[in-house]
Amino acid sequence: MQQEEIIEGYYGASKGLKKSGIYAKLDFLQSATGLVLALFMIAHMFLVSSILISDEAMYKVAKFFEGSLFLKAGEPAIVSVVAAGVILILVVHAFLALRKFPINYRQYKVFKTHKHLMKHGDTSLWFIQALTGFAMFFLASIHLFVMLTEPESIGPHGSSYRFVTQNFWLLYIFLLFAVELHGSIGLYRLVIKWGWFKNVSIQGLRKVKWAMSVFFIVLGLCTYGAYIKKGLENKDNGIKTMQEAIEADGKFHKE
């Protein structure tokens, strides 16, 4: 009992905080929002990589998000609503995750000492997740704001124009690695935390986690290259404004 009190005093914990159930509820909410964002990330990567199939395939995916199954021409505002929802979930998740970040130098030193002494792989993964999560909050917010305010620009020509001519390639290369590492580590830690797939060993889960990271990073880099290539073709074809790029995408609808 005395040892427990010493540890609690070292970390600044109190008996009142220990008895509160609010922290368990916040922890569950953090896990739930993280799971939603991770699943969205996976779906998003598969959908944007449709440009690897063809420009028309990517255009159809974009129109699908605009409700083309129900509205013949699609409605870009639907994309704005989805983007707003993702932004809300991202902010809530980030706010909840900040509870576990070292908030002062003393806590950082405690974590650093713990990380050095334990030399545990999962502790290092948490540190990577914390860094990528911090970067994602800013990088993803910029991307989501563009999707929120310019949903009509999503398409093979419009998106690639943003990549090359508007220089978003610099943002997206950092966002790619941050999202894929953060998401795969997050899913791995969720599986362990909540006891899913109990018949799979920790070593097996780690292999799945790294396989997932490699797969999505490679897929992301191939997709990244495809948008760069298309963006350079836009320049060669004389597309000088976003409006011209949007009009070029419109030809797929007419077809």
What are these regions (language model features)?
Residues 1-255:
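Membrane-embedded alpha-helical bundles that constitute the cytochrome b-like, heme-associated redox core
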